[in-house]
Amino acid sequence: MFLFDWFWNVLSFLGLYNKNAKILFLGLDNAGKTTLLGVLKDGRLSSYLPTFHPTSEELAMGNIRFKAFDLGGHESARRLWKDYYPSVDAIVYLIDSSAQDRFVESKKELDSLLSSDELANVPFLILGNKVDIGNTSEEKFRASLGLTQTTGKGKTTLNGVRPIEVFMCSVVKRYGYAEGFRWLANYL
C-alpha cells in the first residue's frame, strides 16, 4: 500500500491535484484493463470475467479525481469506443505484450484511435502489459506497433504534437504502470 500511496502523492506533487479527468481504458480483450482499474481502485488483485458492458469508476486518490471508463476489448465492444471520445482527457491503451500473435490486431485498433479527429489532441499512454510472462523487449514491442518515435518519457512539451509514450509493465507484479501514469499526469 505504501507504493500505491506514494504514487498518488507524486501525482499530486506534479500538479495534478484538484483536477478532474475523464480517462478511457482501451485495448483488446484480455490485455489487463479491468485488472489495472481494480488495482488502482482498491489496491487488490482479483480475477475478472471478460468485460461485456462498459463500466466506470470514480477514483479519488490523494487530491486527484478522475472518472475511468473500462469499455471492454472484444470485437463487438470496440464498436462502442467512439461513443466515449467526446470530452475525454486521456487514453490508456493496454496491450498484452506476451500475445505477439495479436500485435497486428492491436496495432490496427491503435492506429484507428490515433487517426480519429476527436482524439487528435488527447494524450495516449500505451502500456505493454504482462512483461512478467512474455519475452518481448520494449524495442520489439514499439517496432511491432510502429511507435519508434514517441514524445519521450520526460516532461516534454512539443507544440502541435500529441503526447504519446510506451511503458512496459506488469499489473499483476505491480510495476511499470506507475511511471506511465506519472508521465500522463504531465499532460492532463
UniProtKB/Swiss-Prot annotation:
Binding site for GDP: N30, A31, G32, K33, T34, T35, N129, K130, D132, V171
Keyword terms of this UniProt record: Cytoplasm, Endoplasmic reticulum, ER-Golgi transport, Golgi apparatus, GTP-binding, Hydrolase, Magnesium, Membrane, Metal-binding, Nucleotide-binding, Protein transport, Transport
UniProt cross-references to PROSITE patterns, sorted A to Z: SAR1
Short motif STAR, span: 2-4
Entry EC number(s): 3.6.5.2
Binding site for Mg(2+): D29, D70
GO molecular function: GTP binding; GTPase activity; metal ion binding
Class of this enzyme: hydrolase
Signal peptide start-end: none
Annotated GO biological process: endoplasmic reticulum to Golgi vesicle-mediated transport; intracellular protein transport; membrane organization; regulation of COPII vesicle coating; vesicle organization
Main location: endoplasmic reticulum
Catalytic activity: GTP + H2O = GDP + phosphate + H(+)
Residues annotated as binding GTP: N30, G32, K33, T34, T35, N129, K130, D132, V171
One Pfam family from the record: Arf
Membrane topology: Peripheral membrane protein
GO terms under cellular component: COPII vesicle coat; cytosol; endoplasmic reticulum exit site; endoplasmic reticulum membrane; Golgi cisterna membrane; phagocytic vesicle
Region (Mediates recruitment to ER membranes): 10-14
Assembly notes: Homodimer; upon association with membrane. Part of the coat protein complex II/COPII, composed of SEC23/24 and SEC13/31 heterodimers, that it helps recruit and assemble on endoplasmic reticulum (ER) membranes at ER exit sites.
Described function: Small GTPase that cycles between an active GTP-bound and an inactive GDP-bound state and mainly functions in vesicle-mediated endoplasmic reticulum (ER) to Golgi transport. The active GTP-bound form inserts into the endoplasmic reticulum membrane where it recruits the remainder of the coat protein complex II/COPII. The coat protein complex II assembling and polymerizing on endoplasmic reticulum membrane is responsible for both the sorting of cargos and the deformation and budding of membranes into vesicles destined to the Golgi.
NCBIfam families referenced in this protein's UniProt entry, alphabetically: small_GTP
Official protein name in the record: Small COPII coat GTPase SAR1A
